[in-house]
Regions:
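Conserved glycine(s) in the ABC-transporter nucleotide-binding domain "signature"
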Residues: 1-119
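Anion-binding and metal-coordination hotspots
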Residues: 2-3, 17, 28-31, 101-629
Length: 629
């Protein structure tokens, strides 16, 4: 059945949560409801009435297909039960990987202080974050959907656990690092770093906290980028405090939202598996997120000599000097335009310096001196290699994007829309003089900035990378830098498949708990991908595991079924994501999902089970699911 629950937020906004629920009775014969599927909020849908109509049809179809007919050939009597519950058993494959990470041992030490099993809660939240990401409240409502799992906890206990997870974040990451090394190995000859931000479902920023400085410091105005506040109390005592900024701050959002955001930096190994992460206030500059995480990896994770690979946002003098002073290397992209690229202007357009491979690729590489600061603060001269190259495919892509914006800019001139800020307004320039007469214009007008377009065209397809590794040739530099795509994809996964944002919790320990849950979920998925040689995407892995459902029928028999009931519903509401699926495409997706499942189970010590199986045999099958070594 469909259930609509209204929720009133602190700002007075009322939203209607949409769920499909099934009724059941607990051990005390008390009526209860369990959430089968959650569909977000009604107010967020483009057409709420059409959405509800489609959902009602979907629910009728779901109930009809839950009814199980057992033929005479099965030797079991015919059975039909409208109220039978469909359970999820695909989680067992994720649990098999999770168990190899040995996090339960750490949680059990903490668990002695708690009245509830936080090890099981953490595992439950990680698995649900992969299979069915949602708010903690909605996740709790699905607590009985996993076959064979019984959780004795309240929603309040689940929220309290988040604070414990937040406090244990660093310990969890250290244990993960050790176990991943032994499970699939780590290659840290190169490590990849990037940062992104995530927005909150809240309008207000979090307040800063202040911590007293003991002993007092002199000659400093900041401690590790934290401003020192000097105070004299009523009794004349002089005190110092350092400001600890809250995490929820407005900053430069990568998704262009105005809500408070939080920064996350992520360090990843050469295999594409995360090493560690850290969160920062939302107004933290990207370039300031690298060193705290790199220092943590070097100090607590035993990270040896490595080459740090990052984009131009991390290309600062301090980051470069610190990496080299620590005995590490660096590889950053380099800006070619403007003041930051001034030193390369003469070389960029000197065709005689390039080695031409074909019409789409030419390059030049050279070693240059640069000014640096050593560990003792002395100015020194060091060397680095610079690769400048032209890529024809990139040039054509950049030209096409610019042509689209210029076309929109021209159109805006005809309908007077140029006063509104758009992505294309940078190609417009204000006219101060009448073009034909040279007289001062009596009213503001705009024209296409042809000079800017011409200047941009010069750099189409041009790219530069600087590195400390003087022995790397141009091919190895490009190949190494290309590895950054995996960390960019990881951010996409956290925002789509894992739905890390919007963030609903606001307590800072809860926020850190939320992030470590998502981090572990990402690690679990990456481990499985690594075992499968990255043959299928995370999206397809999740879809295949969500296909694995079962329901208990008469005489201790389990019906193991392929869950494809959402196919019809996806077809009806595909406009939500502006994707039009045909019946043939949906059938193809389902067929692909079955084949993906067959690929996944090859990495486990288990076999396919039949659609009708005794309960004891089914549970033996589930126990046999272990990750292959």
């Amino acid at each position: 059945m469909i259930k609509l629950d209204k929720h009133t937020y602190k700002n007075g906004v009322v939203k209607t949560q949409i769920r499909i629920v099934d009724g059941y009775r607990n051990e005390n014969d008390e009526p209860r409801q369990r959430t089968i599927e959650s569909f977000g909020y009604l107010e967020d849908k483009e057409n709420p009435d059409e959405f509800l109509a489609a959902l009602r049809e979907y629910d009728k179809k779901r109930i009809k297909e839950k009814r199980v007919n057992i033929t005479k050939a099965s030797t079991l009597p015919f059975y039909e039960d409208d109220g039978s519950t469909v359970y999820h058993f695909g989680y067992k494959y994720l649990e098999a990987i999770y168990n190899e990470l040995k996090l339960d041992e750490m949680f059990n030490k903490i668990d002695s202080k708690c009245k509830y099993n936080i090890a099981e809660i953490f595992k439950f939240l990680v698995i649900q974050r992969i299979l069915s990401p949602d708010s903690k409240r909605a996740t709790y409502q699905r607590i009985e959907n996993l076959y064979g799992k019984k959780y004795d906890l309240s929603l309040h206990q689940l929220y309290r656990s988040l604070a414990i997870f937040g406090d244990a974040s660093n310990d969890i990451q250290r244990i993960l690092n050790d176990e991943i090394k032994s499970l699939v190995g780590r290659d840290t000859s190169n490590v990849f770093f990037d940062s992104t931000n995530y927005y909150f479902q809240k309008d207000l920023e979090s307040e800063d906290q202040y911590e007293e400085v003991c002993p007092l410091v002199t000659g400093k105005t900041n401690i590790k980028n934290q401003k020192i506040i000097e105070v004299t109390d009523e009794e004349g005592n002089y005190k110092q405090f350092k400001a600890i900024p809250g995490l929820m701050k407005r900053g430069v959002s990568k998704e262009h939202v105005v809500d408070p955001i939080i920064q996350m930096g992520l360090l990843m190994d050469k295999n594409g598996i995360p090493i560690c992460m850290q969160v920062f206030p939302g107004n933290t500059s990207d370039s300031l997120t690298l060193l705290p995480i790199l220092n943590e990896a070097k100090g607590s994770f035993g990270l040896g000599r490595t080459v740090v690979v990052a984009d131009k946002g991390m290309n600062t003098t301090k980051n470069i000097d610190t990496a080299v002073n620590n005995g590490d290397g660096f590889m950053f992209s380099q800006i070619l335009k403007g003041k930051k690229g001034k030193r390369y202007q003469d070389r960029i357009f000197d065709e005689s310096l390039y080695t031409v491979v074909d019409e789409d690729y030419r390059y030049q590489e050279f070693i240059e001196d640069y000014d640096a600061t050593d560990l003792d603060g002395n100015r020194v001269v060091r060397q680095r290699k610079v690769l400048i190259y032209y890529n024809g495919a990139t040039a054509r892509r950049e030209k096409n994007k610019r042509d689209e914006k210029v076309a929109k800019a021209k159109k805006s001139l005809t309908n007077n829309a140029y006063m509104v800020s758009h992505g294309y307004d940078k190609y417009l320039i204000e006219e101060s003089y009448v073009e034909n007469t040279g007289e001062i214009a009596d009213k503001k007008s705009y024209k296409i900035n042809k000079e800017k377009i011409k200047e941009e065209e010069k750099y189409d397809g041009m790219f530069a990378i600087i590195t400390s590794e003087l022995d790397y040739d141009q091919a190895k530099i490009r190949e190494t830098y290309h590895g950054l795509w995996r960390i960019e994809e990881s951010f996409r996964v956290t925002k789509s498949e894992l739905e890390l944002r919007p963030i609903y919790v606001t307590n800072e320990k809860h926020i850190k708990g939320h992030f470590i849950i998502c981090f572990v979920a990402l690690c679990v998925l990456r481990i499985l991908q690594k075992k499968m040689n990255y043959s299928i995407s995370i999206e397809r892995i999740v879809r295949a595991l969500n296909m694995c459902k079962c329901t208990e029928i008469v005489n201790g028999v389990i019906h193991v079924l392929k869950d494809d009931t959402t196919k019809q519903f996806v077809k009806k509401i595909s406009q939500e994501k502006k994707i039009e699926y045909t019946s043939e495409e949906l059938d193809k997706i389902l067929s692909e999902t079955v084949e993906d499942y067959k690929l996944i189970i090859k990495e486990f010590n288990s076999k396919l089970c039949t659609s009708l199986i005794t309960k004891s045999d089914f549970e033996s099958f589930l126990k046999s699911i272990k990750l292959k070594k």
